[in-house]
Amino acid sequence: MGVTVVSHPLVQHKLTIMRKKETSTASFRRLLKEISLLLCYEVTRDLELTTMPIETPLMPMDAPVLEGKKLVFASILRAGNGLLEGMLDLVPAARVAHIGLYRDHDTLQPVEYYFKAPEDIVNRLIIVVDPMLATGHSAIAAIDKLKERGATNIRFLCLLAAPEGIKRFTEAHPDVDVFTASIDERLDEKGYIVPGLGDAGDRMYGTK
């Protein structure tokens, strides 16, 4: 297992616009959805296909299709929903889990307030989404919870990651692949990724 940085030019271009402090809430939200489409392509690159019989205008054939119902997108609330929307546009048959966590600004530790997931997650691929992998505490807590429910096939998708968060996360869950658009320099004293883009949830919902 490892860490994949999605360096596609479109991803990097859109990420740069999102980083700019003058980017509006509406533009930030739109760009996050657009990037999620591109990141989803990468994280689902090796999904298994099955075949189904169809008829084209010319003849019958057995055609490849994705078994979308075997896929779960797990959003770490609230910012994860910004990535979730675009991914569901691509895979509308996927199931959805919501994991409510917020970071205590004094201890930087995650506090859980909500968890809802499909009951039959044991045999499904679960892609956990959260724009930021900063300290890593929230991502670790979310995946701890999913594993408690029996999940064994999990991937983590984020927009930005800090080296400290990646180290902590991969030590806690070495079996979970990480996909990100950028690994930034470091965390500051408040646990924010720098240079980063600020608080993704606040910028997405205009609550900063």
UniProtKB/Swiss-Prot annotation:
Phylogenetic lineage: Bacteria, Pseudomonadati, Pseudomonadota, Alphaproteobacteria, Hyphomicrobiales
Binding site for 5-phospho-alpha-D-ribose 1-diphosphate: R78, R103, D130, P131, M132, L133, A134, T135, G136, H137, S138, D199
Species: Brucella anthropi (strain ATCC 49188 / DSM 6882 / CCUG 24695 / JCM 21032 / LMG 3331 / NBRC 15819 / NCTC 12168 / Alc 37) (Ochrobactrum anthropi)
Biological role stated in the UniProt entry: Catalyzes the conversion of uracil and 5-phospho-alpha-D-ribose 1-diphosphate (PRPP) to UMP and diphosphate.
Catalytic activity: UMP + diphosphate = 5-phospho-alpha-D-ribose 1-diphosphate + uracil
Cofactor info, note text: Binds 1 Mg(2+) ion per subunit. The magnesium is bound as Mg-PRPP.
Binding sites annotated in the UniProt record for uracil: I193, G198, D199, A200
Pathway note: Pyrimidine metabolism; UMP biosynthesis via salvage pathway; UMP from uracil: step 1/1
GO molecular function (one): GTP binding
Keyword annotations from UniProtKB, A to Z: Allosteric enzyme, Glycosyltransferase, GTP-binding, Magnesium, Nucleotide-binding, Transferase
Protein name: Uracil phosphoribosyltransferase
Entry cofactors: Mg(2+)
Similarity comment: Belongs to the UPRTase family.
Keyword Glycosyltransferase: yes
Keyword RNA-binding set for record: no
UniProt-listed Pfam families: UPRTase (PF14681)
Regulation: Allosterically activated by GTP.
Domain of life: Bacteria
